[in-house]
Amino acid sequence: MTYNYSKLLGRMREKNITQEILAKKIGLQPPTLSQKLNNKAKFKQAEISNICDVLDIDAKEIGGYFFAH
Protein backbone atom coordinates (compact mmCIF):
# COMPACT_ATOMS: atom_id res chain seq x y z
CA MET A 1 0.00 0.00 0.00
CA THR A 2 1.29 3.46 -0.85
CA TYR A 3 0.59 6.61 1.07
CA ASN A 4 0.43 10.22 -0.04
CA TYR A 5 2.74 12.35 2.09
CA SER A 6 2.03 15.66 0.33
CA LYS A 7 0.36 17.12 3.45
CA LEU A 8 3.40 16.13 5.53
CA LEU A 9 5.75 17.69 2.99
CA GLY A 10 3.63 20.84 3.03
CA ARG A 11 3.89 21.01 6.82
CA MET A 12 7.65 20.69 6.53
CA ARG A 13 7.68 23.65 4.12
CA GLU A 14 5.49 25.68 6.51
CA LYS A 15 7.97 25.06 9.31
CA ASN A 16 11.01 25.61 7.03
CA ILE A 17 12.32 22.14 7.85
CA THR A 18 14.12 20.23 5.11
CA GLN A 19 14.19 16.45 4.86
CA GLU A 20 17.80 16.54 6.02
CA ILE A 21 16.98 18.60 9.12
CA LEU A 22 13.94 16.48 9.97
CA ALA A 23 15.92 13.27 9.55
CA LYS A 24 18.58 14.47 11.97
CA LYS A 25 15.99 15.65 14.51
CA ILE A 26 14.31 12.23 14.59
CA GLY A 27 17.49 10.18 14.48
CA LEU A 28 17.39 8.94 10.88
CA GLN A 29 19.83 9.27 8.03
CA PRO A 30 18.45 11.56 5.27
CA PRO A 31 18.35 8.73 2.67
CA THR A 32 16.28 6.62 5.07
CA LEU A 33 13.72 9.40 5.54
CA SER A 34 13.62 9.88 1.77
CA GLN A 35 12.86 6.17 1.29
CA LYS A 36 9.99 6.42 3.76
CA LEU A 37 8.55 9.54 2.10
CA ASN A 38 8.76 7.77 -1.27
CA ASN A 39 6.97 4.63 -0.02
CA LYS A 40 10.08 2.46 -0.32
CA ALA A 41 10.04 1.82 3.46
CA LYS A 42 7.43 2.20 6.19
CA PHE A 43 7.44 4.63 9.09
CA LYS A 44 7.68 3.12 12.57
CA GLN A 45 5.28 4.32 15.25
CA ALA A 46 8.08 6.04 17.20
CA GLU A 47 9.21 7.88 14.04
CA ILE A 48 5.69 9.15 13.43
CA SER A 49 5.49 10.34 17.03
CA ASN A 50 8.85 12.11 16.77
CA ILE A 51 7.90 13.78 13.49
CA CYS A 52 4.66 15.01 15.05
CA ASP A 53 6.64 16.51 17.93
CA VAL A 54 9.07 18.28 15.58
CA LEU A 55 6.37 19.58 13.23
CA ASP A 56 3.75 20.34 15.92
CA ILE A 57 1.20 17.95 14.44
CA ASP A 58 -1.71 17.20 16.79
CA ALA A 59 -2.36 13.52 17.50
CA LYS A 60 -5.89 13.87 16.08
CA GLU A 61 -4.41 14.89 12.72
CA ILE A 62 -1.91 12.04 12.29
CA GLY A 63 -4.10 10.15 9.82
CA GLY A 64 -4.17 13.02 7.36
CA TYR A 65 -0.40 13.32 7.39
CA PHE A 66 0.67 9.67 7.43
CA PHE A 67 -2.16 7.48 6.19
CA ALA A 68 -3.69 9.36 3.25
CA HIS A 69 -3.97 7.45 -0.02
Residue ranges, per PLM feature:
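Short alpha-helical DNA-recognition segment
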Residues: N16-Q35
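Residues within the helices of the helix-turn-helix
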Residues: L9, E20, S49
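Short C-terminal boundary/hinge segments that cap the last helix of small helical domains
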Residues: D56-H69
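The alpha-helix within a helix-turn-helix
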Residues: M12, A23, C52
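A short, Lys/Arg-rich alpha-helix, primarily the initiator
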Residues: M1-I17
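DNA major-groove recognition helix of helix-turn-helix
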Residues: L37, E47, F66
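DNA-binding alpha-helical recognition surfaces that contact promoter or target DNA
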Residues: G10, Q35, G64
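Short, basic-rich loop-to-helix N-cap that marks the start of a DNA-contacting helix
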Residues: K40-N50
